[in-house]
Curated annotation (Swiss-Prot):
Protein name, as recorded: NADH dehydrogenase [ubiquinone] 1 alpha subcomplex subunit 4-like 2
Stretches assigned to coiled coil: none
Organism field: Bos taurus
Similarity-based family: Belongs to the complex I NDUFA4 subunit family.
GO cellular component terms, A-Z: respiratory chain complex IV
InterPro entries tied to this protein: B12D (IPR010530)
Superkingdom of the source species: Eukaryota
Length: 87
């Protein structure tokens, strides 16, 4: 057991306990979904500023028609009018 690799030990445990396969699948799916959501937040959120020199306040460049929420049920962003001054 001391000389076996981690993959071989994992495969042996899965072979002994096949009921763990769905749990490992759901945990992997949850971790993958969480990683993709964090990536979406980092790249699409107006609150995140990656370049402070050229774009110090990225939220000021948003127009009212930009949808940055993950899910907007009752808001139609195409019908909104601009009510803010330009910066």
């Amino acid at each position: 057991m001391a000389g076996t690799s981690l993959g071989a030990r994992f495969y042996r445990q899965i072979k002994r306990h096949p009921g763990l396969i769905p749990m490992i699948g759901f945990i992997g799916l949850g971790m993958g979904s969480a990683a993709l959501y964090l990536l979406r937040l980092a790249l699409r959120s107006p609150d995140v500023c990656w370049d402070r020199k050229n774009n110090p306040e990225p939220w000021n460049r948003l127009s009212p028609n930009d949808q940055y929420k993950f899910l907007a049920v009752s808001t139609d962003y195409k019908k909104l009018k601009k009510d803010r001054p330009d910066f």
